């Protein structure tokens, strides 16, 4: 929206009042620096969460490995940090209790200093970030969801259709496997009945093997 500016806005009295009001509200200032914005909005007390986080006191292994890690890194510049950590862990286990004792005492002293400096300190480990799950392609996910919906809404129709299709395929295979030179009309009645029952049994066994419901 636009406001019509009158000539009275530029009078000395109005300008003096604007300057005085502007000086009373310094928190309305905005700068390019993000930390400056926080300080202006919070009255100068804005701090980042990382600065408020208190580190844990060092244990005996950390006290010992500070100088050892630097020494190993200088002697083996091509060694990775993970390999250095494995080597330091192995070397620490190889030390005797007498060799570890000075570092335990130093860690105890640091723990006491930490307790005096932060009396209400409580260790809160950071939560690990969840890894994003691998998503299926769009077309495959749509097909899977569509099949699931169809099977859920029409369970009997879906299963019956599969059973009928499987049965028709089995019957067509059995019909093609018959000898072409023998006609069913020329066979005796008992042979035709035995052949029909045999074909029915084979179809039934095939359907049971496939795990599909059979509709007769």
Curated annotation (Swiss-Prot):
Q: Where is the composition biased (Polar residues)?
A: 175-187
Which subcellular locations apply to this protein?
Nucleus speckle; Cytoplasm; Nucleus
Q: Which InterPro entries does the UniProt record give?
A: HMG_box_dom (IPR009071), HMG_box_dom_sf (IPR036910), SRY (IPR017253), SRY-related_HMG-box_TF-like (IPR050140)
Single Gene Ontology BP term? cell differentiation
Recorded GO terms, molecular function? calmodulin binding; DNA-binding transcription activator activity, RNA polymerase II-specific; RNA polymerase II cis-regulatory region sequence-specific DNA binding
The entry's DNA-binding region feature spans 54-122
Keyword list (alphabetical) reads: Activator, Calmodulin-binding, Cytoplasm, Differentiation, DNA-binding, Nucleus, Repressor, Sexual differentiation, Transcription, Transcription regulation
Task: Please name every pair of cysteines joined by a disulfide bond in this record.
Answer: none
Region feature (Disordered): 25-54, 169-188
Q: Name one GO cellular component term.
A: nuclear speck
Q: Does the keyword DNA-binding apply?
A: yes
The record describes its quaternary structure and partners as: Interacts with CALM, EP300, HDAC3, KPNB1, ZNF208 isoform KRAB-O, PARP1, SLC9A3R2 and WT1. The interaction with EP300 modulates its DNA-binding activity. The interaction with KPNB1 is sensitive to dissociation by Ran in the GTP-bound form. Interaction with PARP1 impaired its DNA-binding activity.
Its function? Transcriptional regulator that controls a genetic switch in male development. It is necessary and sufficient for initiating male sex determination by directing the development of supporting cell precursors (pre-Sertoli cells) as Sertoli rather than granulosa cells. Involved in different aspects of gene regulation including promoter activation or repression. Binds to the DNA consensus sequence 5'-[AT]AACAA[AT]-3'. SRY HMG box recognizes DNA by partial intercalation in the minor groove and promotes DNA bending. Also involved in pre-mRNA splicing.
Concerning its family, UniProt says: Belongs to the SRY family.
What is the protein named?
Sex-determining region Y protein
Could you tell me which species this protein originates from? Mesoplodon stejnegeri
């Amino acid at each position: 929206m636009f406001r019509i500016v009158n000539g009275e806005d530029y009078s000395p009295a109005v300008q003096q009042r604007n300057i005085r009001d502007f000086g009373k509200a310094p928190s309305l200032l905005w700068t390019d620096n993000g930390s400056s914005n926080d300080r202006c909005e919070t009255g100068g007390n804005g701090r980042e969460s990382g600065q408020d986080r208190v580190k844990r006191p060092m244990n005996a292994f950390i006290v010992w490995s500070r100088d050892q890690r630097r020494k190993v890194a200088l002697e083996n510049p091509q060694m990775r940090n993970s390999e250095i950590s494995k080597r330091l862990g192995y070397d620490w286990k190889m030390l005797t209790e007498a060799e570890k004792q000075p570092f335990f005492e130093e860690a105890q002293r640091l723990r006491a200093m930490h307790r005096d400096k932060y009396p209400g300190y409580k260790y809160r480990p950071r939560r690990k970030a969840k890894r994003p799950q691998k998503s299926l392609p769009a077309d495959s996910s749509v097909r899977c969801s569509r099949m699931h919906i169809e099977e859920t809404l029409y369970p009997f129709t879906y299963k019956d259709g599969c059973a009928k299709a499987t049965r028709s395929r089995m019957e067509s295979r059995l019909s093609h496997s018959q000898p072409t030179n023998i006609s069913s009309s020329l066979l005796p009645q008992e042979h035709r009945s035995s052949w029909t029952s045999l074909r029915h049994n084979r179809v039934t066994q095939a359907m049971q093997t496939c795990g599909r419901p059979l509709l007769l």
